[in-house]
Structure formats: structure tokens, C-alpha cells
């Protein structure tokens, strides 16, 4: 290697200031899933609290007064697991302990490697099992699931997931289906995480599940928004690509205090991220769980320029290379947008080179008119992680060989070797980012629900991303 590299590794960030390290509390059922009509939802919920005010051991059950949480869940895995009898919890779109246990049980029964994680192979096997059971009349009704002496998801049924442990008042799950339009079916349940009680009181959450085609759900958009209690904060977790033209999405956007997405699951990352960036200009707050995954990279970048001699050289950066897992470049674009927004770079050109490596080249102009060259490279990996498009490594450098701004951040051996092999006459500071255990979707979502208002850094970074993607569209 022609360059000089000063290695600082490994570096691990702990988030003790963000979340508790204690286990989630036990979860008990106040009302098992019950099918109801749309018109009877509120009256049935009121009845739950009237008949369940006094619990066993003198505990009083009361509804939380925190926030409403709506989940748009197009993935049918949870619903299929319930229909086949593997899952007996609420349909809430959240992959908590109970869902993990249910997936493991189903995988064992279907002859799929029991990882507790969903996969295309598992989804296909689950869909085939559902179709067979439906054809043979072996699907379980809600009542039958409740009366089963043993539940396959029992291993995780006594533990509240991260979201339930945060004591939401009401969780509304929308499950769009692909069957014939037969209106919308509703189901209610209520669960209580057993935390430290105050005056023998259990703080419980209502679950409302609505199933129907996309058109059917859109027709009752007014009913759905009314179910989000108007006096409490309203969060919407849209577990799909943003659909600016879909009437239900527009309605939820206008009624929610915050829309939460995860750009790592976008079907068309560039087009969907463009839509998302355009929404950031609206009054409603937008949050992307994929942005939260960049925190270790951002903190290490900032830390690299803490020494005075490096801080004074930050304006000399005019080269940036970012490697990411091929398939989704949302994280790479957002990190680039963050750096550019901090250094006041303006994007001026964009080009794309398809191939084994997906190469995106963006040219910026600094405030002093200095040209900046950026390159994003999608690397094909044999062993990809759970999150498509995770950053692998990045390099900040300068054409000024005397500038002390050379920085390499990498997440593994391959990433470090590739960046260090670039050579050059600069002295590079190298740091390794160690994978964190608390970066999964459920935990990121739990932290997001504890935040209020807009994230100025995210908004400013997405303004740069929007400008980059508009250049891409123009090209």
C-alpha cells in the first residue's frame, strides 16, 4: 500500500443513554383476539374495560394514556402464522419474542431451517401450507386458536415486545389482502405488560386489526383516522414504500404526528427515497429507521475530526468513497447527504454505471467553488446481513496530500482491505465499526417512539438527497 494508515480498532458504541438493558416485562392477555363488526369497535372496547376493571390478585386493569400507534402491514407472515395456528398473539406487525417463537415452530414443521427469521423460502412454504389448509378446510378460527391447550409460540408468549413495553394506548394494524374485495374485517384484543405497578394498577394496550383489500381500507379511511385517539400523539409505521398517490397514505400523513418508514425495505430504493425526500418538506414529521442505523458511522466520523489539527483540515476533504451491500443504496445516499449538508456542499452532477459493482458518481461544489468527487459502490456479498444495503466501508480524502483529513471507516475485514488498498500519499486514520446488537428494527422503532418532533439533521441531509436524486432523474 502506498498510503500510511493509523489503525484504531475495534470501536464499539454502547447506547445505554438511549435504552434500558433490562429484559422486556412479562405480558398477559386481558382480552384474547375477538372478531367484531366495524360499527361495534368502540363499544366492544369499552366493554373490555368495564368487565376487566378488577383483575386477579386485586390488580386493576386500565388503558394507557400515552399514544396511538398505527401499523400498515402488507407482509402476510404474521396473519398466515395465526391462521395456521402457530401464532396466537395480536396482529400488530411487530417481530417480537412471540413472533420469533412462532416462526421457529412453523419452520420446524415445514422443514425449513429454524432460524426464527423470515425469508423468501419460508414465506413460500408458509403460503403453500396456508393454501393447502384452506383447500382442505383446516384453517383455525379465532375461537379455535384461543382454546388450543398448547400454543407453538408459547416460548415467547410471556414476554412483551419492545413496543408493548413502551405502553402505547392503542395499536391499530392495517393488513391489506390480495383476495376479492369483501369489505373490511375487524378484530380486537388487549394485553398488559406487567411492570412495576402503581397502586395495584395494570397499564394495558388495545389492539385493533383491520383486514381488507387496499381499496377496501381506503374506503374506510375516515373510520381509521377516527380510531387514532385525537387527544393523544399519533404515530404511523408505514411498513412499505411510500405511496404518495394512495389516498389512505395521504390521509394518514395529514392526521399523524409522525410517519415512520424503513428505507431498507423499499422496493425501488431510488424512486421511493425520492418520494420520501419530497415528503420531508411537509409539516408532518418523517422518520426513517434506516437513518438511525447510520448513527455509529456518523459518531465515528465526527470523532475522527475531534483533534484540532484534523478539525482545521475538514475543509480540505474533496474525495469521498462509500461501499455498501449491493441492492439498496439508501443508507449510502443518506450518509453522503449528511456529510454534504455539514460541509455545505451543493450537488451539481450525477452518473450511474451498472454492472457487478453498482457505481454512483456524484460531483459537488464546495462554498469556495472547490469540486468534490463522491463515489458510491454497491458490493455483491455472498453473506448479506438482515438489513439490505448496510454500509461496509467509507473513505474521506483530499487531493491536497498535506491535509490531515484522511479517514477510513470499515465494518469488516473485506471493507477495510478494500479501502486501505486504495493507496495514496495521505496519512489515513482507520477505525473499525463493530456491529451492534441493538440495531434491529424492533429496537430502533422502540427508541423512535420515545422521540418528539422533527430531526433537523435528518431533514437537512434529506434535502441534499433530494437534490442528488433530482439530478439522477434529470439525467
Curated annotation (Swiss-Prot):
Q: Which SUPFAM superfamilies match?
A: PGBD-like
| Pfam families reported for this sequence | OpcA_G6PD_assem, OpcA_G6PD_C, PG_binding_1
The record's listing under InterPro entries reads: G6PDH_assembly_OpcA, OpcA_G6PD_C, OpcA_G6PD_N, Peptidoglycan-bd-like, PGBD-like_sf, PGBDSf
Q: What does this protein do?
A: May be involved in the functional assembly of glucose 6-phosphate dehydrogenase.
What is the recorded name of this protein?
A: Putative OxPP cycle protein OpcA
Q: What is the lineage of its organism?
A: Bacteria, Bacillati, Cyanobacteriota, Cyanophyceae, Synechococcales
Q: What gene is this protein a product of?
A: opcA
Amino acid at each position: 500500500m502506498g498510503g500510511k494508515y493509523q489503525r484504531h480498532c475495534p470501536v464499539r458504541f454502547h447506547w445505554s443513554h438511549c435504552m434500558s438493558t433490562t429484559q422486556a416485562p412479562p405480558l398477559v392477555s386481558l382480552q384474547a383476539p375477538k372478531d367484531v363488526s366495524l360499527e361495534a369497535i368502540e363499544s366492544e372496547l369499552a366493554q373490555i374495560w368495564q368487565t376487566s376493571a378488577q383483575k386477579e390478585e386485586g390488580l386493576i386493569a386500565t388503558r394507557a394514556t400515552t399514544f396511538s400507534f398505527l401499523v400498515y402491514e402488507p407482509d402476510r407472515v404474521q396473519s398466515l402464522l395465526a391462521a395456521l395456528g402457530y401464532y396466537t398473539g395480536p396482529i400488530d406487525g411487530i417481530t417480537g419474542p412471540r413472533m420469533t417463537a412462532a416462526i421457529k415452530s412453523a419452520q420446524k414443521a415445514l422443514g425449513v431451517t429454524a432460524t426464527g427469521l423470515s425469508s423468501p423460502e419460508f414465506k413460500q412454504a408458509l403460503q403453500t401450507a396456508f393454501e393447502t389448509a384452506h383447500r382442505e378446510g383446516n384453517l383455525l378460527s379465532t375461537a379455535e386458536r384461543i382454546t388450543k391447550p398448547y400454543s407453538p409460540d408459547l416460548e415467547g408468549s410471556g414476554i412483551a415486545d419492545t413496543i408493548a413495553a413502551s405502553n402505547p394506548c392503542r395499536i391499530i394494524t392495517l393488513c391489506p389482502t390480495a383476495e376479492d374485495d369483501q369489505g373490511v374485517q375487524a378484530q380486537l384484543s388487549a394485553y398488559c405488560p406487567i411492570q412495576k405497578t402503581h397502586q395495584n394498577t395494570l397499564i394495558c394496550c388495545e389492539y385493533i386489526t383491520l383486514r381488507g383489500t387496499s381499496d377496501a381500507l381506503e374506503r374506510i379511511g375516515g373510520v381509521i383516522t377516527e380510531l387514532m385517539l385525537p387527544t393523544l400523539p399519533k404515530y404511523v409505521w408505514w411498513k412499505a414504500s411510500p405511496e404518495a398517490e394512495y389516498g389512505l397514505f395521504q390521509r394518514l400523513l395529514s392526521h399523524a404526528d409522525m410517519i415512520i418508514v424503513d428505507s431498507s425495505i423499499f422496493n425501488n430504493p431510488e424512486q421511493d427515497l425520492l418520494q420520501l425526500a419530497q415528503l420531508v418538506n411537509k409539516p408532518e414529521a418523517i422518520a426513517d429507521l434506516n437513518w438511525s442505523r447510520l448513527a455509529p458511522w456518523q459518531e465515528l466520523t465526527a470523532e475522527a475530526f475531534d483533534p484540532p489539527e484534523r478539525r482545521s483540515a475538514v475543509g480540505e476533504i474533496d474525495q469521498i468513497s462509500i461501499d455498501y451491500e449491493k441492492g439498496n443504496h439508501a443508507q449510502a445516499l443518506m450518509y453522503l447527504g449528511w456529510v454534504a449538508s455539514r460541509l455545505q456542499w451543493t450537488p451539481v452532477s450525477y452518473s450511474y454505471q451498472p454492472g457487478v459493482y453498482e457505481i454512483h458518481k456524484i460531483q459537488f461544489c464546495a462554498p469556495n467553488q472547490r469540486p468534490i468527487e463522491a463515489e458510491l459502490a454497491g458490493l455483491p456479498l455472498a453473506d448479506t446481513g438482515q438489513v439490505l444495503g448496510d454500509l461496509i466501508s467509507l473513505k474521506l480524502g483530499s487531493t491536497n496530500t498535506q491535509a490531515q483529513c484522511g479517514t477510513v471507516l470499515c465494518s469488516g475485514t473485506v471493507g477495510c482491505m478494500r479501502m486501505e488498498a486504495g493507496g495514496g500519499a495521505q496519512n489515513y486514520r482507520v477505525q473499525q465499526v463493530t456491529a451492534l446488537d441493538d440495531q434491529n428494527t424492533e429496537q430502533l422503532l422502540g427508541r423512535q417512539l420515545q422521540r418528539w418532533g422533527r430531526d433537523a439533521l435528518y431533514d437537512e441531509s434529506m434535502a441534499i438527497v433530494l437534490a442528488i436524486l433530482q439530478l439522477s432523474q434529470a439525467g
